[in-house]
Structure formats: structure tokens, C-alpha cells
């Protein structure tokens, strides 16, 4: 976990629990998993979306329902349940200039009054993964840095080429020459184009 600066070595400690829209009526998230007592939810956004915490409430509700059912937990009993801690990260790589990190809160969506306090909160940490942002994170996760380089390269070629397909193709060639995402781009070239 680069964000928390933790390194998990045992793959058996990882339980992927990504929501698929087949079961949840068009509700899916990019990736979610349990590891180290944390329910991790990761989303990718190419546009700024201040409503991510509301989506997070929906996702976490479903994820915790699944967790309770899978572990045969009694939500009606007198014993307090022990649940994994939720962590919600949104990776942003849109063209609008945003800070390296931003906290998005569900409570910011509520119709506010001075004397009322919400009984519900969900916080998403939005991390800007555009090239040049979050240098420490990029240094710790080379693959993410290479992705940021590739996206920047595509955007540069979009200024020069007539079609998106040409821009992506030239960006792929340039990145492969520079040893950026080389294995992925060679293997998935047809899918990327």
C-alpha cells in the first residue's frame, strides 16, 4: 500500500471483492479488496467528480453487506461487530488542474444549516496522478509513474495528430522506445488502440 507506506508480501492476505454490475444492477467500482484489516476501494476518474463520496457510500454499503454475509456476522446481536476499516482513494488524471491531494467529503453535498450536524460521513482522498504531481507516490510506484508518462505523451500527440487513434499509436511507439509500460503496451497494443 504505497499511500500508507505499507508493504504486504503474502498474497494470501489479499481478498479481492470488486463489485460487478451483473449482481448489483449497474453498480460497479474499479477495484476493491481486503488486506491488513482494511477494506480498500480504488476508483479512477478522468474528470473531476465531487460526488465520489456519495458513490463511495453506495459501494461500501454493498461491500459491507457482502462481508457480513460471507463471515456469517450477526448484525442483530448484542455483540459489537469488528469490521475492516474503509479506505477510499480516487485516482484523478483529468485535464483540469487539481492539487496533488484533495479530501472529498459526503457532508459537503448535504444541504447545510448551521445547527444541524450530519450523522453520516464518507471521505474520499483524491490523488492527482497526472505527470508532475505526487512525486513521492510516483517514486514509490514506478508503474503508476509510467502510466502518467503515457497519458502525458498521448495528450502531447493529440495536439499534433488528426485522430485519437494516430495520437495513441505514436504515443505507444514513443513510450516503448523509452521503456515506459513496454511490456503492457506490446502485449495489449490492439486493445489500447
Could you describe each region identified by the protein language model?
Residues 1-193:
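Elongated, amphipathic alpha-helical interaction scaffolds
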Amino acid at each position: 500500500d504505497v499511500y500508507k507506506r505499507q508493504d504486504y508480501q503474502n498474497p494470501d492476505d489479499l481478498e479481492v471483492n470488486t463489485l460487478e454490475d451483473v449482481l448489483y444492477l449497474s453498480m460497479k467500482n474499479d477495484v476493491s479488496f481486503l488486506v491488513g484489516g482494511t477494506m480498500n476501494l480504488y476508483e479512477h476518474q478522468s474528470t473531476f467528480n465531487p460526488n465520489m463520496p456519495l458513490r463511495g457510500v453506495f459501494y461500501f454499503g454493498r461491500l459491507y453487506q457482502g462481508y457480513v454475509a460471507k463471515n456469517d456476522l450477526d448484525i442483530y446481536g448484542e455483540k459489537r461487530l469488528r469490521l475492516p476499516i474503509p479506505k477510499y482513494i480516487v485516482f484523478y488524471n483529468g485535464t483540469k488542474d487539481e492539487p496533488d491531494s484533495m479530501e472529498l467529503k459526503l457532508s459537503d453535498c448535504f444541504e447545510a444549516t448551521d445547527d444541524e450536524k450530519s450523522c453520516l460521513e464518507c471521505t474520499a482522498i483524491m490523488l492527482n496522478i497526472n505527470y508532475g504531481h505526487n512525486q513521492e507516490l510516483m517514486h514509490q510506484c514506478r508503474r503508476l509513474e509510467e502510466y502518467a508518462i503515457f497519458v502525458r505523451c498521448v495528450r502531447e500527440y493529440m495536439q499534433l495528430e488528426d485522430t485519437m487513434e494516430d495520437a495513441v499509436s505514436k504515443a505507444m511507439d514513443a513510450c516503448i522506445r523509452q521503456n515506459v509500460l513496454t511490456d503492457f503496451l506490446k502485449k495489449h497494443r490492439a486493445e489500447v488502440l
